[in-house]
């Protein structure tokens, strides 16, 4: 017997993936240059040359160590470099020990949700949202996913709806800007208003 909730997820293929496969099938017929695929965020420009050079330098090193395990937190020198970059740009005082590297954003979100979720917690996502958020929250972290609709005229945050959704069980709000899939970028005014609302709710409920 397998987990029925996971089986249900597997029985419903992602609409995004369906569109992606349709784009591939059309490209095989009419040519890739004639298909404009907006289904998946694949890059349409090459990586910076510095990235290419760095990859080549890594592959030219010890061929055995290249394919070995790193620290569970990620390579120490990379974490130190990232901490230095954050400190330089934002005036922070991070060290490499403050950072944890993952293989992509999905793994980072999943780990973070599981790390902070407790029984009965709720996570708020702002629609439209990346569908896997719901799976990370409910199946991965065992929490409740609460969806707040956007202000449809500009896809900024509907603060009346958000304020209504916030309660003592709210553990986190997932903020994604530029938004996936709408592409909307939250304005400075939106971010400041969000910070004010959260400060108000923190005082009301006695916790972040």
Regions found by a protein language model. Name each.
Residues 63-207:
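Conserved core of the PLP fold type I
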């Amino acid at each position: 017997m397998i987990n029925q909730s996971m089986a249900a997820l597997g029985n419903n293929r992602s609409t995004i993936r369906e569109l992606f496969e349709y784009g591939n099938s059309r490209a095989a017929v009419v040519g890739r240059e004639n298909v404009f695929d907006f289904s998946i965020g694949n890059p349409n420009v090459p990586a910076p040359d510095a990235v290419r050079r760095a990859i080549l330098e890594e592959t030219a090193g010890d061929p055995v160590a290249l394919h070995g395990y790193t620290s569970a937190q990620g390579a120490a020198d990379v974490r130190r470099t990232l901490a230095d970059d954050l400190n330089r740009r934002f005036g922070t005082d991070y060290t490499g020990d403050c950072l944890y590297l993952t293989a992509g954003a999905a793994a980072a979100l999943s780990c973070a949700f599981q790390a902070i979720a407790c029984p009965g917690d709720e996570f708020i996502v702002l629609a439209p949202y990346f569908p896997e958020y719901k799976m990370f929250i409910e199946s991965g972290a065992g929490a409740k996913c609460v969806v707040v609709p956007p202000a449809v005229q500009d896809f900024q945050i509907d603060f009346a709806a958000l304020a209504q959704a916030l309660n003592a069980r709210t553990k986190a709000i997932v903020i994604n800007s530029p938004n996936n899939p709408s592409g909307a970028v939250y304005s400075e005014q939106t971010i400041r208003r969000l910070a004010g609302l959260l400060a108000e709710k923190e005082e009301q409920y006695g916790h972040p």
